[in-house]
Amino acid sequence: MNKKSCLGCHQLNDEGGRIGPSLNRSSFNYKPEWLYAWISNPQNFRPNTKMPNLGLKPEEARAITSFLVSFQPEEENEEFEAPEGWKQYLSSGGDAKRGEKIFHDPEGIANCSKCHLVNGRGGTVGPDLSFAGTSRTRKFLLESILNPSVVITHGYQTVMILTKNRKFITGIKKNEDESGIDIVDKDGGNLHIPREKIKKFKIQKISTMPGNFKDLLEIQDVTDVLAYLGSLTLPAITNSDN
């Protein structure tokens, strides 16, 4: 990890950078085959990603993947496990077709596609879920539905800005430079707040995604949405040939 300067951008325990996502929960958040494929060549999946192609040999990518999958943060006393109450959501496979309807129904309670993009369809306030089934574990996807503030996907943190004329502006922070801060508001609109108009701003620890879907949706609804998300895959990613 140190040799390839991973810690320059990524956090492990309390060490490392904050440019990229924390890797403390890699085994819970990501599928091993996705970690291997992403580490090997991230531009294959996101051409505009800031993560460079490290030029890793297959055995190096495998070694880093194995390390991340087995890594346990020092402050954690137990391995990441699904809470007992999650079993009711994870005990069956669910109906992906029904889950797709729930996800994309603009009149439904969930209306997930208002904020999330799937294969060019939906909003951009939240993360693109077009290949969620390839990259994310089922447990992580469930956690993101039931308690979205536990892990806020890197690049989708909410920022609250107080302007010098005492106006509060909230949105997803997309960029910050000398000219100001670019955000996406709750309706998907792009806003640029000039630096000279900003008094102060703070990154919020609460996700913009509602945290009460456990109360709003039936267990079967959540299970079916999970099945739909799990079906959103890229062509098979394997490391069997490496």
Report the location of each language-model feature:
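Flexible gly/pro/ser-rich segments immediately N-terminal to CXXCH heme-c attachment motifs
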Residues: 1-2, 23-30, 51-58, 103-107, ...
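Periplasmic/extracellular electron-transfer cofactor-ligation site
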Residues: 2-22, 44-45, 70-77, 101-128, ...
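Gly/Gly-Pro-rich "capping" loops immediately C-terminal to redox-active cysteine motifs
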Residues: 8-40, 50-53, 119-146, 157-203
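Residue-level signal for cytosolic alpha-helical hairpin/rod architecture
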Residues: 16, 20, 48, 83-84, ...
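Short glycine-rich, low-complexity segments
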Residues: 141-161, 165, 218-219, 223-233, ...
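Intrinsically disordered, low-complexity linker and terminal regions at domain boundaries
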Residues: 200-224
